[in-house]
């Protein structure tokens, strides 16, 4: 048969299939902009900032609407009420993990982030319980974070107040906390293997937020047959995965079943307990995928929040001064901050919350999946439908947070200056897919920020009026623009008295 004829017939079949699927699905799903055959609404979406496109569509179609990314329909939830109703009130039905093809090429549906069904339920439950176990041990997670915070301070002191880009140093600290939990050891900040891992984490988070990766996730065939930055993402993933596998093998050789040292040992013990269960979710492949998930998620999100937060503190010097005054009054300079201090530091607590709200790190979160046919607000959403959750619409809700585009710790303070909780604070998402490391991340952010500001004054290289805090990249994540800063050491009280 003529190759040209084959091509024409193939394209025609795809076109007809696309038209049939779209017309069949649109009668049942929530309304939305009219999709084009094959490419769907892709041309109507600003890939450099999907969140802005979602906000625009919500003004036309309301809090629940449908977008076609390629030939797949995605139901979009916009606003607190719609998101809460779906993720919390109907948590089980919306608990699936949606399509994310680039990551699926690596994890194969295993691990704790991109898995579904029993794999996800059992691995997530085990991971949370194991993290809690370490939190109740002799050397708690808070101890590990405090220790790492002091290592971070010593590394920052080496700059001697000279300007530098803090990206890698701020990435090393949360990564080392995760390493101490998973591998039982931390890295020196100059370790070449560590720096290589940090570079790959940082590069992947940046590339994940690029328009090209959004296109790859929309049209998965690109991943296997076309060149592009997605290949570097996969290369980085496989490097990290192989590194984790080597660490697992080392643990297998030195395992003491009665004295588990870290997360890997606990998982290996679980594998041994279930070795006669052919349906067990606890396999070597699952262990590697889970540790890789924890390694990546526990590093880049926290480090980016730290980096973005310090940029905001550089710009808002009045806010920084108030935090440092509170640190001086409650903690002083001669002991390390601890989580017990937080209840006495409402302003600092509000600042940490406002940083997370303002930067809106992952504006549309990872996609969810409907686990069974469901009627939602008079719409029929069939099992297997992908769901996009707009966290931006909640974190920047102008009714809950007046002037949401303004950085203002007052969003989390009452009229008496006490810390004020908000149900709209959802940087970690909500429901059954809420970030498993939320407690760890909250502890890290409070202790790292307070320890840095206890020991250093921040100085910008440019006038504070010229500091730009708008994201440099707005895709999967909001990444801060490049900046350099000076960390000027604050003299401790004991060093001051020695000079008197």
From Swiss-Prot:
InterPro entries: Cyt_P450 (IPR001128), Cyt_P450_CS (IPR017972), Cyt_P450_E_grp-I (IPR002401), Cyt_P450_E_grp-I_CYP2B-like (IPR008068), Cyt_P450_sf (IPR036396), Cytochrome_P450_fam2 (IPR050182). GO terms for molecular function: arachidonate 11,12-epoxygenase activity; arachidonate 14,15-epoxygenase activity; heme binding; iron ion binding; monooxygenase activity; oxidoreductase activity, acting on paired donors, with incorporation or reduction of molecular oxygen, reduced flavin or flavoprotein as one donor, and incorporation of one atom of oxygen; retinoic acid 4-hydroxylase activity; testosterone 16-alpha-hydroxylase activity. It comes from the Eukaryota. Its EC number is 1.14.14.1. Keywords: Endoplasmic reticulum, Fatty acid metabolism, Heme, Iron, Lipid metabolism, Membrane, Metal-binding, Microsome, Monooxygenase, Oxidoreductase, Steroid metabolism. Pathway: Lipid metabolism; arachidonate metabolism; Steroid metabolism. It is found in: Endoplasmic reticulum membrane; Microsome membrane. CDD domains: CYP2C-like. It is an enzyme of class 1 (oxidoreductase). Heme binds at residue 435. It is a peripheral membrane protein. Its cofactor is heme. Liver and kidney; male-specific. It catalyses: an organic molecule + reduced [NADPH--hemoprotein reductase] + O2 = an alcohol + oxidized [NADPH--hemoprotein reductase] + H2O + H(+); testosterone + reduced [NADPH--hemoprotein reductase] + O2 = 2alpha,17beta-dihydroxyandrost-4-en-3-one + oxidized [NADPH--hemoprotein reductase] + H2O + H(+); testosterone + reduced [NADPH--hemoprotein reductase] + O2 = 16alpha,17beta-dihydroxyandrost-4-en-3-one + oxidized [NADPH--hemoprotein reductase] + H2O + H(+); (5Z,8Z,11Z,14Z)-eicosatetraenoate + reduced [NADPH--hemoprotein reductase] + O2 = (8R,9S)-epoxy-(5Z,11Z,14Z)-eicosatrienoate + oxidized [NADPH--hemoprotein reductase] + H2O + H(+). GO terms for biological process: epoxygenase P450 pathway; icosanoid biosynthetic process; organic acid metabolic process; retinoic acid metabolic process; steroid metabolic process; xenobiotic metabolic process. One of its GO terms (cellular component) is cytoplasm. SUPFAM superfamilies: Cytochrome P450. The keyword Oxidoreductase applies. Changing residue 4 to A: In strain: Wistar Gunn. Its main location: endoplasmic reticulum. Changing residue 116 to S: In strain: Wistar Gunn. Belongs to the cytochrome P450 family. A cytochrome P450 monooxygenase involved in the metabolism of steroid hormones and fatty acids. Catalyzes the hydroxylation of carbon-hydrogen bonds. Metabolizes testosterone to 2alpha- and 16alpha-hydroxytestosterone. Catalyzes the epoxidation of double bonds of polyunsaturated fatty acids (PUFAs). Converts arachidonic acid (ARA, C20:4(n-6)) primarily to epoxyeicosatrienoic acid (EET) regioisomers, 8,9-, 11,12-, and 14,15-EET, with both R,S and S,R stereochemistry. Preferentially produces 11R,12S-EET enantiomer. This is Cytochrome P450 2C11. The gene is Cyp2c11.
